[in-house]
Amino acid sequence: MARAAGLRALVGIEAAGRGRRVAASPSPGGTPAASRGLPGWPGFCGVGCGSSSSSSFAPPRMQARRAAGSAARTRSPSQSNGWITGGSASEDGRLSWDYSSFKGRRPSMEDRFSIKMTTINEQTVSLFGVFDGHGGSLAAEYLKEHLFENLVNHPELLRDTKLAISQTFLKTDADFLESVSSNPFRDDGSTAVTAILVGNHLYVGNVGDSRVVALKAGKAVPLSEDHKPNRKDEQKRIEDAGGIVVFDDTWRVNGLLAMSRAFGNRALKHYVKAEPDIQEKVVDESLEYLILATDGLWDVMRNEDAVSLLKAQDGPKAAAMKLTEVAHSRLTLDNITCIVLQFHHGKSTNSN
């Protein structure tokens, strides 16, 4: 994502998860949580703080424990000419998912994604996220490696999931900025949109303009709202903090960044926060699919169009590929990454 003038990009693609080989080119077709000290999070240090490993952050009773056996059935990884795709299904058959990530017309790949299945105190927790880097891939890569690791070690994850998500986003942002503080010539940033499943509750947290859209009762239902500088509440927040919102091919914070919240972006941090908006939904039988995607998809596709394409496909594998192919065919200029998550209510499924 080209967001700020003069910021460098890194070449290459790295993403969590595993996949399968595909063709080289597509066919046509609230109140902030404290970011310092983190009240209510005693003993949490966070990535980049001291020498402790992530496994030592939380009290022992809340340590994330891997479920007996494999948490998910996963296909072999594959990556070819800027593409990476793949998918898995949960052991209990209630979830299946696929992802498709493509460099597209950009010279470098700044998107990342992460998928994590774990068990905490006998409660299954499933975490899905996409991260769209700008000014380089350092921030997106850091989120891929650390955001969910921090979250599953938060001592309040099961009791107060919204608090845990908010504090983890802010802490991980502070940790990232500390990790790159010795390099004044880099000012990478990233979006994050996440879907966290704890029991039958879904928590969607977003920072920036990546998006989650649900197929619910046959209709497209957005579960996140893009953080754009010209959104009235965001513009007021930025201007109250002393920043400005100006139009330069699109609306930008201080004439630079085309989103109003992000991880990283040290030079604009006073205006561009990593505080997430969080939505909580109960998972019932009307919830069929989720699409998590970067704006390489949403810039050229309405929510309703994406859901229509999804409904015409046979499962998440075909849907993830089709969404990416169509976005590319519509001449998106950005990297494209999407995760398609399917809910199987009252039945089990085998991975493809």
Swiss-Prot record:
Its EC number is 3.1.3.16. Mn(2+) 2 binds at residues 132, 295, 334. Residues 96-343 form the PPM-type phosphatase domain. GO terms for molecular function: metal ion binding; protein serine/threonine phosphatase activity. Keywords: Hydrolase, Magnesium, Manganese, Metal-binding, Protein phosphatase. Signal peptide: none annotated. Residues 18-37, 53-87 are annotated as: Disordered. Transmembrane segments: none annotated. InterPro entries: PP2C, PP2C_BS, PPM-type-like_dom_sf, PPM-type_phosphatase-like_dom. Binds 2 magnesium or manganese ions per subunit. It holds the Pfam family PP2C. Mn(2+) 1 binds at residues 132-133. Residues 23-37, 53-75 have a biased composition (Low complexity). Its cofactor is Mg(2+); Mn(2+). It catalyses: O-phospho-L-seryl-[protein] + H2O = L-seryl-[protein] + phosphate; O-phospho-L-threonyl-[protein] + H2O = L-threonyl-[protein] + phosphate. GO terms for biological process: signal transduction. It comes from the Eukaryota. Belongs to the PP2C family. This is Probable protein phosphatase 2C 56. The lineage of its organism: Eukaryota, Viridiplantae, Streptophyta, Embryophyta, Tracheophyta.
